[in-house]
Amino acid sequence: MPLYVTLAVCALALVCLGAAIAAIAIGKHVFTRTTTHSTVAMGQPVRDGNFMFTADKMKCGIHQIGTPDDFQTPTGQFCIVSMKIINVGKEPAIYADSIQKAFNPNGNRYTADTPAGYYANSDPLVFLNEINPGNHITVQIVYDIPNGASIDKLELHENPYTKGAIVRMPH
């Protein structure tokens, strides 16, 4: 067997070994995703990964967020969900509004409007800081949905690879 073939096979083996070590070190949740969700009503806590989420209230029909001089306007209407998030795990975790999904009764999915979220939260760094175990944050998640539409449920995640938890929203 030529030397370059032997070297290529060895390099491939090292890459595979590195991937296996990374999978063990990082954890299997990075490479897998299940579809089973915990489901609760608004106001009840629900866990996904290291986070315990409690959606306390939702207000829709908002057409401006911010101050009179510095504001965001929606394409349709803003729906703002107030939520408490507790890190109930054993390691720090970062909250990201971009992975918190909302659905209307027909199953249409909406993503959070992060720029509007900066205006809605008194501490915009809430999106950038790690939440240590035992600590909590309170956030306002902002969705820009069509006028006349409603949010039926939220799908909440600690990170993009967790299974998610469902919160049914009142109509």
For every predicted segment, state its role.
Residues 1-171:
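Conserved functional micro-motifs across diverse proteins
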